[in-house]
């Protein structure tokens, strides 16, 4: 899917890491929340409260989820899951466009 229809969008962006990671919250009609964002090259660490699905639409990054020993290369068209109450490290190698979906369990 290249777009979302009939959604509500927060006017203010979520800005992290001195503007190197920027996203906007969108809310679907079923009540679910997603963020659409862009990450510039660099290293980042995020913590999760809920389970997350990260879909990579363009670019390239390495990810290491808490508890993993090795980095995993993720490229355009790939995704990865992060458990709730966890964390993950990213090494963005090329500008990334992404969607993050949040789940209750």
PLM features: what roles do these ranges have?
Residues 27-49, 79-84:
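Conserved short histidine dyad/triad with adjacent acidic residue
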Residues 68-88:
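Short acidic-glycine-tyrosine-enriched beta hairpin
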Residues 17, 44-46, 64:
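Short loop/turn motifs at secondary-structure junctions and domain boundaries
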């Amino acid at each position: 899917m290249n777009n979302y229809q009939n959604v509500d969008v927060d006017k203010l962006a979520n800005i992290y890491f001195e503007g190197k990671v920027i996203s906007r919250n969108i809310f679907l009609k079923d009540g679910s929340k997603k963020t659409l964002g862009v990450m510039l090259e660099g290293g980042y660490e995020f913590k999760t409260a809920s389970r997350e699905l990260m879909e990579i639409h363009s670019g390239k990054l390495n990810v290491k989820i808490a508890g993993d020993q090795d980095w995993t290369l993720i490229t355009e068209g790939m995704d990865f899951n992060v458990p709730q109450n966890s964390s993950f490290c990213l090494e963005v190698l090329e500008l990334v466009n992404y969607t993050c979906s949040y789940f209750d369990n």
